Each structure stands twice: as C-alpha cells, then as structure tokens.
From Swiss-Prot:
GO BP annotations, alphabetical order: mRNA processing; mRNA transport; negative regulation of translation; P-body assembly; stress granule assembly
Positions with biased composition (Basic and acidic residues): 418-427
Motif (DEAD box): 177-180
Designated gene of the protein: DHH1
Location within or outside the cell: Cytoplasm, P-body
Function, as annotated: ATP-dependent RNA helicase involved in mRNA turnover, and more specifically in mRNA decapping. Is involved in G1/S DNA-damage checkpoint recovery, probably through the regulation of the translational status of a subset of mRNAs. May also have a role in translation and mRNA nuclear export.
Protein name: ATP-dependent RNA helicase DHH1
Top-tier EC class: hydrolase
Amino acid sequence: MSEWKESLNVPKKDTRHKTEDVTATKGTGFEDFFLKRELLMGIFEAGFENPSPIQEEAIPIALAGRDILARAKNGTGKTAAFVIPALQQVNPKVNKIQALIMVPTRELALQTSQVCKTLGKHLGIKVMVTTGGTNLRDDIMRLEDTVHVLVGTPGRVLDLAGKGVADLSESPMFIMDEADKLLSPDFTPIIEQVLHFFPEDRQILLFSATFPLTVKAFMDRNLHKPYEINLMDELTLRGITQYYAFVDEKQKLHCLNTLFSKLDINQSIIFCNSTVRVELLARKITELGYSCYYSHAKMIQSHRNRVFHEFRNGTCRNLVCSDLLTRGIDIQAVNVVINFDFPKNAETYLHRIGRSGRFGHLGIAINLINWNDRYNLYKIEQELGTEIKPIPAQIDKNLYVAESSENIPRPFPIADMPRGKESKRNEQFQPQQNQNQQQQQDGQNQHSLGPVPPQGPPQGIPGPGYGYPPPQGFPQGMPPQGMPPQGAGGYMPPTPYGYQQQGFPPQPPQGFNNGQPQQPSQ
C-alpha cells in the first residue's frame, strides 16, 4: 500500500452483503482512472472501495470529454459517477464556475453539494448550492467569491444566470441528475434557457433511472454524438422485496401500527399522495408513541432543511413525506419504505421504493392498497416487470435486516435511536364509538386519518417528535399552540448546512466515525 494511503482516515468498512446491482463490475479500481491523488484521498476517506458498474462505465467516458446519456437504477452510485469526473476536471486556480450540476429538488441539491465537498475536500475546490426558497441576495453575495462547482435547482440557476451573477460562459460541463424530471414539460423551457449561457463546446451529462421520449428529443437537439449507457437489465433493485397488504381505507392506520410493532425498522419512509395526508398521518403516528418527522413541498424551506438533516443524521426513526423525497435522496440506514397511499404510476412507484436498499443493500417496500388501487397494482407490475407479493404473516428478517447491523452507516447506534412505545394497544388509536358518532364521522370524512385540518401549521402538535421544527422568530408570529418553548426539545434556528448552535444537535456517542454524520454512499 502506498504511503499516502496509509495516512488516510478511512471509515469502518461496511461488511453488509451487496447485490449484483453494485458488484457486477469488470474489476476496475478508482486508481485505474488516473485521478488526482487529492481526489483519490477524498474518495477513499468517504468509504468508497471500488467503482460500481455505473461509475466504471461513466467516469472514463466523462473524463474523455464525451456527452453522456446514462441510465442506471436508483441507489447504484450515479451521483459519484458524475461528481468524480467533474471534480477531476476543475482547476482550483481558475476563479470561474467550471461545472454546473442541476437537480430537480432542494433536498437533492443539498445532498449533492455535500457529496462534492466530501469527495473534493483535499482539492481546494469551492462548491456552492443555490435553490429556491432561500434568500436571493445571499446567493448573489456568495457568488462574488470564488465558486468552482455550482449545484442548484433550475429556477434559481436561471435567475442568477439571467442577472449576470452566475457566469457560465466559460463553464465546460453541464450535468443533469434525475434528467427525466428536469426535462419534463415543467422544467424543459428553463433548461433550454440555461443552456444558452454555456459555451458551444460544453459537455452535457444526463443521468437518470428512467428516460421518457422528452429526454430523447432534448438529446437530439443539444447533445453531440452522446455515449449511451444503459445498465437497466431490470427496473427494480435486486435487494428490495416488495409486498402489498389489501386494507380497507379506515384500517390503514391500524395496519401501519401493526407493521411498526412487528418489523425490525432501522429507519423508514412512509409516502402519502397529498401534503394534507402527510401532516395528518405524522400526527397520528406521533400520537401512537413513535418518533416521526414529516416533510412536503409546502413547508418553509428552513423547516424542510432541518427535517432532512435530522432524519439523515439518525435523530428520528420514521419520516412521512410526499413525493418530494422520491428522487435521489440517499439515506443508507433506511431499510423499510411504506406506501401508505399507493402511487398512481410506475415511475413514482419505482422512485419511492428506491429509497430503501441503497447501494446494493437489503430493504423492503410495503404497499397498503384498497379496492380502488387494484388496477394500478396490476398496471405497475406489468410496466416494471416485477412481482409485488401478498404480505405474509411473518416477514423474514433476512430480507431487509443486515447480518452485521452495527456496521450500517449512522451517527447513532441502533439501540440509541428513538423507537417510541412499541406496546400501544389498538384502543388507544381506535376509540370505541356509538353508532351515531360513527355515522357522523363517516359523513365528515371518508379516510382513515380524521378531518382535514385548516390551512397553516396544525394546532397542538404533540412535542418535538412530530417533526414540525419551529425556529426562533417563527415567521407567522407565535409558534402553533402546543409547541414546546425555546430550549425544550432542543429547538434552535437551523443553518443551511447543519447546526452551529452550541449543544445542538445532540452529539453522537464517542467512537462512531469521530462523531461525524454518515458519509454519502457512492
């Protein structure tokens, strides 16, 4: 081993079994790509061992300057497949934006920028993230300093480029992650406008798990002899086992509570089809005694950032969300995904279940379906060429629990993670009602989560486990009724990239990766 390798601060090796989605390679190593030593140091210190198939295919082609259209499964290392060549080609001595990475969501932008910083920490490269929902003036001031790699969402990038603040005229590389979403009718006009700010000889890299016809139309117009990579021999990840439970709508909460009590959940993500149902379900889960956060697109951006960081860092076990977090979000500790509301199309389903079983690991996806979902279930099975099985009475833990669970990347040992009250009785969330009360309730609401709340933050949130973090200086005035006072539960104003307030968040136990948050997956 080289001397420089011996001095690296390499994290503990992840010994969990990995599927062929990430192990079926040609045996190429990262050093075979002739990368800068400083970049290799960042790669190995992030815990990367060998390239995954998509990295093995894409990195050398990207380094050769070719346009790329790459299709690979969720959770197989696409982010590093474009971040590594971007960092390799950046010259830190040139004070210009040299790579733009465009992503469709704010959370994915934060995550991707963190991967860039982690892998490029020895390169002296400046990475900036810019998204909607943040202060435009702050972004303009930050761009007055040197920025080598810009990560952002379409609207904000176009705004900055149009004002002449983000100079892309000498940027040789334009990367689009989740390109199918970025080239949907909502975003395509913005992407086309952003392209006009690049030089004519720019390099374009498109990465996604699915590519509809809109992507081909864009490719034909803007890419020059693109190199096409398709590693989708099948659409779903091999490590994810899929089940469905046929449940009446009013019994879904009861079924969810049963799953919580029976499954060995490391971390879980529960999906709903509307923002209203996200908040209602999060409230119900917390009332059952389980730690739970929620996140959806209508939340204030600072709240979304805080929920995302805390869930990623292991502060909470369960997250209820809309399709906001279906794309690209990489949290390796998630081993269970539950579709409380069944998705309407195969693309959404594919991205949802891809939040578990990240980077070749194991996970399960459980779908709670009612009578009206049966046609969608059949249609999704046919389109994806996969089988969604009826849920058995007992689920084999070997399907979703790692043999060496202590090696799962997380800042908190599993024993210390908040688990909630596992022995709640059914009567606590299904109170007995007489016939008149039942009829009245049925007339008011036909779903399992109770009446729809008024607009705005819900009232009487039951403590800090609920996931609605009220920072100091709540923008609508006083925090909602029932919020803990300042200092209770550790609430502090968030910062965009973590927490700078003394004593928050709680520090992980000693001996776990020097107390640092989990490293990004490949």
